[in-house]
């Protein structure tokens, strides 16, 4: 990836269209950080809803994706997770429209830490609620 610049490539077979109105939606596959940087160039301030299912930072490997982001015994585990999340949430904030919403899935293990990070990035006055499901 050091020598390659990520680019959007449209795949017509994967086009998402609800009806014939011409409304266009798309699915972006790729590394989330690189994808967010690309979206910032094309969709800054234009996204109404973002849903993120984060790594829960539990060190588990029984999820569909690898949640063992940082070695469990690492003394800087939470700090590394916060740095990982902060860069992505800052980019997500840049994508949101003025009335945009972000929904974030997390478990009880990191919810307090995530809430403080979101307050820093999105401003506490923008917080609406926690949905437990």
What positions do the PLM features span?
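DnaQ-like (DEDDh/DEDDy) 3′-5′ exonuclease domain used for proofreading
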Residues: 1-51, 59-78, 87
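Short, glycine/acidic-enriched loop or turn micro-motifs at the edges of active sites
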Residues: 34, 56, 110
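Generic beta-strand/beta-sheet core signal
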Residues: 50-57, 103-107
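Residues embedded in well-ordered beta-strands within globular domains across many folds
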Residues: 51, 131-132
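Conserved Class I SAM-dependent methyltransferase catalytic core
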Residues: 78-131
């Amino acid at each position: 990836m050091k020598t390659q610049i990520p680019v959007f490539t449209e795949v017509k077979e994967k086009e998402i269209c609800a009806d014939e109105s011409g409304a266009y939606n798309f699915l972006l596959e790729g590394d989330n950080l690189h994808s967010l940087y690309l979206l910032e160039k094309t969709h800054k301030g234009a996204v109404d809803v973002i849903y993120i299912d984060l790594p829960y930072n539990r060190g588990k490997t029984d999820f569909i994706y690898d949640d063992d982001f940082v070695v469990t015994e690492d003394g800087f585990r939470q700090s590394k997770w916060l740095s990982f999340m902060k860069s992505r949430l800052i980019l997500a904030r840049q994508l949101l429209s003025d009335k945009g919403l972000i929904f974030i899935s997390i478990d009880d293990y990191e919810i307090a830490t995530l809430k403080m990070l979101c307050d820093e990035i999105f401003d506490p006055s923008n917080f609406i609620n926690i949905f437990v499901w």
